[in-house]
Amino acid sequence: MDGGGGMLGAVVCLLLVFAIFPLLLWRRRSDAAHRLPPQPLQDERVLRGGPAPGPAARRMRRRPLSTSADASTSRDRDVDDADSDLEEEIQDVPRGSKKKEKKRQDREAQRQAEEAARDSRRTKQDRYAEMRRKKDEEREAQERLMEEEARARKAKEEEAAALEFEKWKGAFSVDAEGTTESDTQDDGQGLLHNFVEYIKNQKCVPLEDLAAEFRMRTQDCINRIITLEGMDRLSGVMDDRGKFIYISTEEMKAVADYIRKQGRVSISHLASNSNQFIDLEPKPQYNEESNLDENAAAGTEL
């Protein structure tokens, strides 16, 4: 019986060894994974070949194994919960960092957009200022050109008027009583004065009579009147009947004042009331002076 009991104990021990060994291996792997210190082996004496425990000892041995398994499961659960919390915290940290990074990027994009808008406005203002500067320069250059052209035109007109005046002085002639060409040129200024004064005194003079008075052709007389008007020596109008009506500067001013006061005035109304502003009565001073000059000339001849 003792030999049979020993064999039975040995078989039971082997079974326990084979049953406990996987548990021990699993616990070591779990502890290694969670960095936990290894648990002491409670049944070390069984592995060392000690006496076989009895049924009560085996029951007591099973209870710690179950308790140890429960504790290991609880620890694993706690470790898993801790890992889960750690992962959530790790996930929360990047999420907050991403929000901050996104806000920073948004602020940077807004700053760049504002800077680009300012640059665009500055560029437009510079372009507008440059365009205005060029336009001002072009306008000033055009004004200078117009002034130069006006001065050149005025100088040309004055030169032409002076040349025409010199020609006109030589065109006057006197009756052939021994007067030479040099005498005519010397008396040109006096003849010009007489021509102008004759028209002013006659007020309304037929062009043919004027030409006959100064021994000129009618067309030459018309040209001379136009020249004198350009020189501001005479002012007036030529009608379609071949008459020149002299109108002084004061009379023209009176007509302009009348038109300004009346507003719109028809030509017929102005013509009917022209005698209020323009004196058309001839003045005899020139005739008397002419007679005196003729008498003096006749006395000289005698």
From Swiss-Prot:
Biased composition (Basic and acidic residues): 103-151
Compositional bias annotation for Acidic residues: 79-91
Cytoplasmic side: 27-302
Annotated region described as Disordered, given as residue ranges: 36-151, 279-302
Membrane topology field: Single-pass membrane protein
Lineage top rank: taxon: Eukaryota
Cysteines joined through disulfide linkages: none
Single GO MF annotation: ubiquitin-like protein ligase binding
Keywords: Endoplasmic reticulum, Membrane, Transmembrane, Transmembrane helix, Ubl conjugation pathway
Known role: Substrate adapter for ufmylation, the covalent attachment of the ubiquitin-like modifier UFM1 to substrate proteins.
Protein name: DDRGK domain-containing protein 1
